[in-house]
Amino acid sequence: MHPLPEYPRPAMRRDSYENLNGLWKYAITQTAEYPAAWDGSILVPYSPETKASGVGRTLQPGQWLHYHCTFAPPPGEGGRVLLHFGAVDDACAVQVNGHLVGGHRGGYWPFTLDVTAQLNDTGRNSLWVAVQDPTDSGTQARGKQTLKPGGMFYPAQSGIWQTVWLERVPENYIQSLTVTPDYDARTVTVKAHTSMPGGAVNLWAVVRAGGVTIAEDWGNDEADRDGEVTLNIPEEHFFPWSSDTPFLYDLTVGTTQGGEEQFDTVHSYFALRKWSCEPDARGVLRFCLNGKPILLNGLLDQGYWPQGLYTPPSDAAVERELSEVKALGFNLLRKHAKIEPQRWYYHCDRLGLVVWQDMVNGGSRYNLWFVTYLTNVLQPLVRRLPDAEPLWGLLSRGKASSRETYRKELQATVEALRCHPCIGCWVPFNEGWGQFDAAGAVQAIRTLDDTRLVDEASGWYDQGGGDVCSIHNYFYPLHVKPGSRTVALSEYGGIAWPMPGHEAPGKTYGYGTAKSRADLTARCKKLQLGTVLPQLKKGLSALVYTQLTDVEDEVNGLFTYDRAEIKPDANAVRSVNAALAAEFAKVTR
């Protein structure tokens, strides 16, 4: 049985699929050489630091983590065989049958290797992956990972942490899709990026709504390797995506070249929806979905699991958690300091959960007093401090190479996730962690994707750009003032309660501590109805409570770390969310 057996890339599916998750051999050594002996078995795709992996060892900077398995090629003959990795943290080299087939750097992004030339088609094949991960001794994106966990920073994880799989594809195949819906024009433009070395690419696309074909067309692009087609959505089949009605259109794309009868076919989906910031009936600037004001009310979600750290126990566990969030009356998750596997976003797409996506923070080791502790307390003094070059060193981006790495990571993030309708806002920087030239980051995002909002600097070191005036407030009275950007309370709350029987050993962390379920419920209700609700009429348009679940010794989640219990009273949470929605509807009319 393969862990996480579901097809890992719902937005670009093929029928050919061979899952390689399962027990592999592993070794941790001091060199990049093939290990003389193996240390044991590891359950892929769980990192060696996790309980689920069966290993429970931390990879140190400078060490090498080696993986080995054998595999048979996918069924079929001819074409190409592709080896896909959902994510490997952080840098890796991959060999098949003793031949280097490629590598990758960056622990949060998928990559694909063509292994056709190295395969033994009639027998078993040897796969060796060698990994290094500097964690917080490097400057690469790492999120909340640290080798010295505590408080708001958590244990490191390394190596393969998303699904590994094989596909057999035609000789000329689709490498990626760019799908761009246009809500106002009621169209969708599909561009297929192919492996074809030259000549005209014929692209065929069909759109279905509820199983009924509603649009289809051929495109012919004489440009090298790529084909493009734009399809019109009939008015009678125009179903906008929203949190209440998250309608997804099915999309099938096929290609051929020069009139040949050899097709590659992939299946995808898309939605028609539009994000904007517009004045409400009273002239106050609001977030708008499909031209209508929307209160975005949600939770900070860091995506950690007690047994698997970054990797969930199952797809069903992910789906269940997201469904529970929706059932409580929330419509937003801020994905904080992590990029999830593609299936997480797919479930948000179909459930109607809006996602604000952080770029994963990196940079040199943080001066926490400067970027977190003092800034949290002295926020009014530092909020508009410029993130110009004199500050880059203090904000952990002193090296030009680190800044260039961030730019590449930003591009990789947008390109990997822009296919998902659920994403409503990009967040390039959080609380100054590795921040530099936020205005440049906003421009880079808009060049890559101008269909979403941008929260330039979540928390502080606000440079006045982007679409969002983004406030983190755990300690001060809340006073919202309308301005030229829409106002979001992008972090608040964080009330801790270590629920008996579900608490982590050691110290607990949070922003104020409740004594019981009743006390936690009362505190949350007072904060949200007494402090937050009155600010809605003044322009507050998005709320992100800290946080969805407990994480390690940070025990300020609505749910316990093991997801077994909701900590405040669930009916009270639903009642508060209904009251916030009703008040927002009232003050925006």
Give the positions of each predicted feature.
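Secreted/periplasmic carbohydrate-active enzymes, especially glycoside hydrolases
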Residues: M1-H347, L351-V355, E409, G424-C425, ...
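Substrate-binding/catalytic cleft of secreted carbohydrate-active enzymes
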Residues: L332-N577, E583-R589
